[in-house]
């Protein structure tokens, strides 16, 4: 029984990433630009219906809702090479076409005005599923639409579908440089509250780390958004391969998330992918040889993480799931795990199992890969809190001066007071405290904290 997933793309960033993601999925499943199956795509074994449904004329249509408050990116999709695969009823473009002006409040209040139309699209897609497992939202949290309207939709989805999983792929701003959006600390903090309270799992991608990886792997000084979006769509397609080419384990979202998220609040995941090759990304550096050990070792290198964090002395992994694609012998996997353990390449929480979980998955027979093995790591790591701390620090600096506050006060959520900001800050501070507490051996029984012994560092020993 397929467990369907509906994708919701909100804002410029969400739609740009989404459009690349659907192109990648079409290539991997042998679906042509108009949704028909290519003549060569005769091998079975894949589950197309998790992400696509078949129309009356047997074309494959993405289970996707595309939402933006300004028309530019959606116009590009509607005139691009893959324009015919989407359901034309599933586009929502803001009536004024002005966007949300990089203002969370603007995006959120627009959500209140237009939610009936958008929820109707979502409910129509949900009704068309046999056994809906959940939603995947793609957005960025720095601007107005992805963060504000995205926040509103997360709340609504949670109310309307309380039993369904909500996973987001959230692009965080580059907190190490000024960036294009001056008010990103405000927007990010407000969106973070909803990601903490209304999503089951958040895959964090940050523009800073994506640019570093793109610059390093692709030899370009200033990577374009298209290149960084390509990295994101590669990660998204890899993280969904176990759903689309199912094996015995990790073949639905619930089982993937259950293995990664032991406590409900700490559900922010980081990713690494290797090797990025010319198949997914133009002019990528070549990696001469890929063995399972080599791929697994590279996945653990901090420079391959798609999040800029500053690990402290006590930072550690809460959980790791490696999705290994390609021609792999399970005994190689076992040997590689032993080697990683012997060399203590990964430090784990002191209160849980110190194990890297591995999902071996087929790769698409229709896409030629330059490498024998490629891998994606989905990890829950306590150092992600350092990214949240940077956002709070930047928010505090701006809030102290009341910088740019007038624009927010003009919107409905802030018309009477600024409590929304204070509540969001409190939620994010609690989240940071939760991740820091997870580094402690007595996380599960805090009352023992006073008598903790010093030797709780748990590397894979």
Curated annotation (Swiss-Prot):
Molecular function per GO: GTP binding; microtubule nucleator activity
Listed GO CC annotations: cytoplasm; equatorial microtubule organizing center; gamma-tubulin ring complex; gamma-tubulin small complex; half bridge of mitotic spindle pole body; inner plaque of mitotic spindle pole body; interphase microtubule organizing center; mating projection tip
Biological-process GO terms, alphabetical: cytoplasmic microtubule organization; meiotic spindle organization; microtubule nucleation; mitotic cell cycle; mitotic cytokinesis, division site positioning; mitotic sister chromatid segregation; mitotic spindle midzone assembly; mitotic spindle organization
Record bears the keyword DNA repair: no
Disulfides per UniProt: none
UniProt keyword Nucleotide-binding, yes or no: yes
Residues involved in GTP binding: 142-148
Keywords noted in UniProt: Cytoplasm, Cytoskeleton, GTP-binding, Microtubule, Nucleotide-binding
Superkingdom per UniProt: Eukaryota
Database matches in Pfam families: Tubulin, Tubulin_C
Cellular localization per UniProt: Cytoplasm, Cytoskeleton, Microtubule organizing center, Spindle pole body
Family to which the UniProt record says this protein belongs: Belongs to the tubulin family.
Job of this protein: Tubulin is the major constituent of microtubules. The gamma chain is found at microtubule organizing centers (MTOC) such as the spindle poles or the centrosome, suggesting that it is involved in the minus-end nucleation of microtubule assembly.
Protein name per UniProt: Tubulin gamma chain
Annotated organism of origin: Neurospora crassa (strain ATCC 24698 / 74-OR23-1A / CBS 708.71 / DSM 1257 / FGSC 987)
Gene assigned in the entry: tbg
């Amino acid at each position: 029984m397929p467990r369907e997933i509906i994708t919701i793309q909100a804002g410029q960033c969400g739609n740009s990433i989404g459009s690349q993601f659907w192109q990648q999925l079409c290539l991997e499943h042998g679906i042509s630009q108009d949704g028909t199956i290519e003549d060569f795509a005769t091998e079975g074994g894949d589950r197309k219906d998790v992400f696509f449904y078949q129309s009356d004329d047997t074309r494959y249509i993405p289970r996707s809702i595309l939402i933006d408050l300004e028309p530019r990116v959606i116009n590009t999709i509607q005139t691009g090479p893959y324009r015919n695969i989407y359901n034309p009823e599933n586009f929502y473009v803001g009536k004024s076409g002005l966007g949300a002006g990089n203002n969370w409040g603007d995006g959120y209040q627009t959500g209140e005005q237009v939610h009936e139309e958008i929820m109707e699209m979502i409910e129509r897609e949900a009704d068309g599923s046999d056994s809906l497992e959940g939603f995947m939202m793609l957005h960025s949290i720095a601007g107005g639409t992805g963060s504000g309207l995205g926040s509103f939709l997360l709340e609504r989805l949670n109310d309307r579908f309380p039993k369904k999983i909500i996973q987001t792929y959230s692009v965080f701003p580059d907190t190490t440089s000024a960036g294009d959006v001056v008010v990103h600390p405000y927007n990010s903090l407000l969106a973070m509250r909803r990601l903490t309270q209304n999503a089951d799992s958040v895959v964090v991608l940050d523009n800073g780390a994506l640019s570093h990886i793109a610059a390093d792997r692709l030899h370009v000084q200033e990577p374009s958004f298209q290149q960084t979006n390509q990295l994101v769509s590669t990660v998204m397609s890899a993280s969904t391969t176990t759903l689309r080419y199912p094996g015995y384990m990790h073949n639905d979202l619930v089982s993937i998330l259950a293995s990664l998220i032991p406590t409900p609040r700490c559900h922010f995941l980081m990713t690494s992918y290797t090797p990025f090759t010319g198949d997914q990304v133009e002019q990528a550096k070549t990696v001469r040889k890929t063995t399972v050990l080599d791929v697994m070792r590279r996945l653990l290198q901090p420079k391959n993480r798609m999040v800029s964090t500053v690990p402290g002395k006590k930072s550690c992994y809460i959980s790791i799931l490696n999705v290994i694609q390609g021609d792999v012998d399970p005994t190689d996997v076992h040997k590689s795990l032993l080697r990683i353990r012997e060399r203590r390449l990964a430090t784990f929480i002191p209160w849980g199992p110190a194990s890297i979980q591995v999902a071996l998955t087929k790769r698409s027979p229709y896409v030629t890969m330059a490498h024998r093995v490629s891998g994606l790591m989905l990890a829950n790591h306590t150092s992600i809190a350092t990214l949240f701390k940077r956002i709070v620090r930047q928010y505090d600096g701006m809030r102290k001066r009341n910088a740019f506050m007038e624009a927010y006060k003009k919107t409905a959520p802030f018309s009477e007071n600024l409590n929304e900001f204070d509540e969001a800050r409190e939620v994010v501070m609690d989240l940071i405290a939760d991740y820091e507490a997870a580094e402690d051996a007595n996380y599960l029984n805090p009352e023992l904290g006073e008598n903790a012994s010093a030797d709780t560092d748990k590397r894979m020993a």
